[in-house]
Amino acid sequence: MKWIGLAVMLSMAPFVRATVDNNNPIANSKAVVICGNARFTVLTPEMIRIEYSEKGMFEDRPTFTVVNRNLELVDFKKKEDDRFLYIQTDKVKLKYRKGTNPKTSPASPENLTITIENHGCETLWYPGKKDPLNLKGTCRTLDGSNGDNKRSELENGLISRSGWAVIDDSWEATRADGSHSFALEPNLEVGYDWWAYRNDPQAIDLYFMGYGNEYKKAIGDFTKIAGKIPLPPAYVFGYWYSRYYSYSADDYREIMREIEKNDIPTDVMILDMDWHWNGKASSESENIGGWTGWSWNTNLIPEPTKLLQEIHDNGYKIALNLHPADGIDSIESPSYYKAMSRELEGKYGSDGKIAWYLDYPDFTKSFFDNVIRDHESEGVDFWWIDWQQGSNCKVEGLDPLWIFNHFHYLDNKRDGRRPMTFSRYAGPGSHRYPIGFSGDTHITWESLDFQPYFTTTATNIGYGWWSHDIGGHMLGYKDDELTARWTQYGIFSPIMRLHSSCSEFNGKEPWRFKKETEEAMEAALRQRHCMIPYLYTMNYRKSEAKRS
């Protein structure tokens, strides 16, 4: 079979390794200009932060989107007269009518403008100006997508043929999922930065980026303020085995034998949700458990620690799938429910269940200490956070998905490990928490056709580590040629993970297909394995050079 000719490797360009540890959210005072209730921070020659607060309360803490504002000082000129303040770098010219709100209704250039040069012509921007030429970013999920029916959900990215883009980090500027960009503050109880309300919820907080067609520089400078894109552990560059199916321990052993027999280099083994009691007869759960579960289904996997050790002995890293929304039930392992009930003093529990409150520090600490630590001591390396319950929680405007990604990633970082998590996209700033799970797509040629575009535009918001269900997840149709082509695309996508729904007929194991398809799929997977040193080296070089 011919190889699919896609220039998707370009989507891996923004990958860099860095940490958020050395970030400083307080800008150098020499980069700041205050004019009444307005504050301007010159971050780069092309990027200016614009704040306005009627209360004169500006934000110097990190936020969900921006974590660093202390950049190398930029030469700029400032002058003012009775009516206007002017700020000019060698790339942008800002003009602000003193004593006014930069935003007008309807949007107009009356109170604030920024002028840039784009393709040899002057371009004027003002707050609220629409941009029909934005090259787009990404969206929360491809769940239920068939072809490009999610195209309209793509959020704006940081690059545009207009020559400018804006990050609106104001509290009132709700994200695409309806949530807000909270501030972050240290929390001694959990040991991580915790969400906090903004100083002035009505304040304007914009980051203007006037980079013209210097697209790489725009993304690179975004990561200077929003945090670098970490380099995950080396094993993520290989092939991930994944299937939603009620496998027993012996089934997993047979899969490992087939993988070895067929000489398929494999680095990650994912155990989907049937590892725990889920209430389904098909998984021998005896009406115990449900969509959410934390305790091993010992009918299928009677000796979990032994199985995980065997998987490790075969050279795989291990992830477990989680749907956490229903909390901790009393039918779970007594050590989980009782320990958390005791520590939380019944605070979040009723009717034999501890409700899900990851947005509160005492719950978070107890959950990680009792549930996550226990499974990781058994051999779990990372977690697949399969959150599908929307963007609402007890704290208005706080997206639980962002909380999951933030805390699971930081927790996975302990003991000096190179961290990672595996979850859906939760808005700008999510690039700090790789890897992304794009969701449940239909098995169609149209879905394959859209995936390279979707993967590439995500890098326009710095989000380079999408993991797709290669081959599609559900519905659609069975087509050997489609599976082979999708697998061939997969080796050039950021993460190579074949996956499928819980159907007898949807398995993506190469040995389930006719000979021609099997050989094409296995050749692709071996090719991906050969690329690991290159992929890792190039990403490492980029990280050391601090380039996007």
Predicted regions and their residues:
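Bacterial Sec-dependent N-terminal signal peptides
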Residues: M1-N23
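Carbohydrate-binding surfaces of carbohydrate-active enzymes
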Residues: N22-P25, V33-I34, V42, E258, ...
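Short alpha-helical segments and helix-capping/turn motifs at coil-helix boundaries
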Residues: P25-A27, V33-G36, E72-V74, E80-D82, ...
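Mature N-terminal segment immediately following signal peptide/propeptide cleavage
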Residues: S29-E51
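A low-complexity, Ser/Thr/Gly/Pro-enriched, surface-exposed linker/loop concept
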Residues: L43-D82
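Catalytic and substrate-binding clefts that recognize carbohydrates or anionic sugar/phosphate headgroups
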Residues: K79-P233, R243-Y244, A249, M256-K261
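Conserved, mostly hydrophobic/aromatic
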Residues: K91, G157, I259, I311, ...
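Aromatic- and carboxylate-enriched substrate-binding clefts and catalytic-loop regions
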Residues: E117, W125, P265-M521
